[in-house]
Amino acid sequence: MTTLAPVRSAKTVQLTTYKRDGSPVATPVSIAFDGGDRAFFRTYDQAWKARRLRRNPQVQVAPSTLLGKVTGPAIPARAILLEGEQARLAARALARRHRLLQAVLVPLAHRVRHYRTLHYELRPR
């Protein structure tokens, strides 16, 4: 089992999910830790990455710039969908780490567009 230590200092990671045919799709996402070794990200229910994660939760994460340029090694991980209190914990961690983006703008955009926000935990494989 690996650790998520290489992405701990990154605010954004490149999340690589996989299509049905196995081809990779990379997307930059904001990431936050809860103070321990738990990493979180969020998306909305109609996003293609959410659909791919429902089929295959195996992912690769690598530290990156906001635009998705990889700045470090990729780590194999598993994305676990969170619900209830765990999802609220993830939302708070993201809001603390990314004050404007994840505390205001993303939740507002999801509400305006009537999306359901999904919170995921990244666990190293």
Regions found by a protein language model. Give the residues of each.
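Residues at structural and domain junctions
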Residues: M1, V7-R8, A39, P76-I80, ...
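Short, well-ordered beta-strand micro-motif
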Residues: E121-R123
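Covalent nucleotidyltransferase core used to form phosphodiester bonds in nucleic acids
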Residues: L4, A39-T43, A47-R52
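Short beta-strand segments
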Residues: A10-D45, V59-P63, G72-I75
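Short, structured beta-strand-loop surface elements
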Residues: Q46-H119
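Generic structural signal for short, solvent-exposed loop/turn connectors between secondary structure elements
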Residues: M1-T2, G84-E85, R125
